[in-house]
Amino acid sequence: PTIDYDEWTPEELAFDEQKPTGISDTIIDTLANEHCCIVQGPPGTGKSYTIASVISSYLDAGKTVCVTTMANKGLIELIKQKPLQKYVKGGRVSKTNLSIDERKQVSGVKAASADLQVPGGEILCATNYQLSSVYSEKKMTLYGLPKYDLIVIEEASQAFLTAIVAFKQLGVDCLIVGDPMQLPPIVKLNNPQYNS
């Protein structure tokens, strides 16, 4: 679907002590009705905790979730969020390129399978680079494209638009999360012809 800016009506979500799950509930409702939701906010506004709460509701329903971001650090920070701790402890969180340090940092996270698939009630955490490998001819021939009930594209302001479009195709529902204060992706060309 194309976004028509005349119809773009973002809704500001604020924490309400009377309804502490109000923000995540609104996002879950939007995903159920629209199958896509964009969440943006500056640092320190609780995006990671809110995302973890949304993911938790999908996992509780036995659904599959994939989270992708530019850097491993962002994935680890999300995995550490309180709403996801029971899944980490239960061995229901997989991550691509899981290092020894990450295993120590977040005990219970397991290495992702080569096909980047997860069973119902589990989450895959992959960098944008690793997740984009599912579109390689070799992986598509071997495994086909994975499909997730929810795909979460974190740090979307740093991702290329083509990556967002490709990753969105992997999910039934798509949650796009970004910080409008972050810089967009930077491409450096070493060819002097383009550096004028």
Give short role names for the model-derived ranges.
Residues 1-35, 91, 96-121:
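Pre-P-loop entry segment of helicase/translocase ATPase cores
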Residues 115-145:
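Conserved helicase/translocase P-loop NTPase motor core
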Residues 50-54, 81, 136-140, 162-170:
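A short acidic, amphipathic alpha-helical/loop segment
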